Amino acid sequence: MRKLSFIMILLFCATFTYAQKGKVTQAISYLTSGKLDQAKKLIDEAMGHESCVAWDKAYFTKGQIYQALYESPVADYKKLDSEAVEKAWEAYQKVIELDVKKKYPKKLAIQYRNLAIDFTNRAAELYNAKEFKKALASFKRVLEIKSSPILTANGEVSI
């Protein structure tokens, strides 16, 4: 009886962990189909689980989703998170930290180029809204992205 109980608990834990990683995969599908609200909901749920906390793919997906939220022309998507571009940056930073196999530098370089543009646009919006401290922080982030080893490793300096 104990063995059966132990096996059942082990199977439950394995299934629950797989379900969380499945949410990341499903979030990617929603992102690809343009359903950013659903993608955000799923990635947020998945990131709350310990099986995704140390998974580089989950953070890369989170970065893509939040970056897409910021870049979206749909106002309802932009309203989902006013700090989406900053959260995308934080997620990409976590990818660099977790990517021990170095699978993501080329993918991150693409995202970084777009992220620099996003932060430039955000800085301009904030400057025009007379939020100078936030605008300066966004401009500093652009400089940080441009000088990042992800972009400078290939000899790229300007975006």
Show where each model-derived region lies.
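Bacterial Sec-dependent N-terminal signal peptides
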Residues: 1-29
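Generic alpha-helix initiation/capping and coil-helix boundary signal
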Residues: 7-12, 39, 81, 135
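Residues that line or immediately flank small-molecule/substrate-binding pockets and catalytic motifs
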Residues: 8, 60, 146
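Start-of-domain marker
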Residues: 20-80
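Alpha-helix initiation/capping motif
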Residues: 21, 55, 153-159
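Short coil/linker segments at helix-helix boundaries
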Residues: 64-158
